[in-house]
Amino acid sequence: MAKPGTRTRKKVKKTVVDGVAHIHASFNNTIVTISDRQGNVLSWATSGGSGFRGSRKSTPFAAQVAAERAGNAAAEYGLKNLDVEVKGPGPGRESAVRALNACGYKITNITDVTPIPHNGCRPPKKRRV
């Protein structure tokens, strides 16, 4: 039985105006993460978590759906402006940015942060199919 004197505090939602959308577009999946400027994650979504499996995960439409889901979840924080950081060579790069724009966010700048080696590790051998 609960004690009569205990009270639970109502959780206060913080309001964030500016945020950063990190889009990681690999050949197999697209991960969209929306955070504040300090890097605290507000929401995230993936193509696989949006109901797409197998080769449909790596389509531009799956990336669009994932970006819409992440954008709608981040709207609870009062987000208005987004910087977009795109990483990776996948097919969902452009469509994820367009979907975030369609969600009503003002996109202030788009940056490509794909890691490029300065002749680092040896790449894997070519596939023979």
UniProtKB/Swiss-Prot annotation:
One of its GO terms (molecular function) is rRNA binding. GO terms for biological process: translation. PROSITE patterns: RIBOSOMAL_S11. The keyword Ribonucleoprotein applies. InterPro entries: Ribosomal_uS11, Ribosomal_uS11_bac-type, Ribosomal_uS11_CS, Ribosomal_uS11_sf. Gene3D superfamilies: Ribosomal protein S11 (3.30.420.80). It holds the Pfam family Ribosomal_S11. Keywords: Ribonucleoprotein, Ribosomal protein, RNA-binding, rRNA-binding. GO terms for cellular component: ribonucleoprotein complex; ribosome. It comes from the Bacteria. Located on the platform of the 30S subunit, it bridges several disparate RNA helices of the 16S rRNA. Forms part of the Shine-Dalgarno cleft in the 70S ribosome. Part of the 30S ribosomal subunit. Interacts with proteins S7 and S18. Binds to IF-3. Belongs to the universal ribosomal protein uS11 family. PANTHER family: 40S RIBOSOMAL PROTEIN S14/30S RIBOSOMAL PROTEIN S11 (PTHR11759). This is Small ribosomal subunit protein uS11. It comes from Marinobacter nauticus (strain ATCC 700491 / DSM 11845 / VT8) (Marinobacter aquaeolei). The lineage of its organism: Bacteria, Pseudomonadati, Pseudomonadota, Gammaproteobacteria, Pseudomonadales.
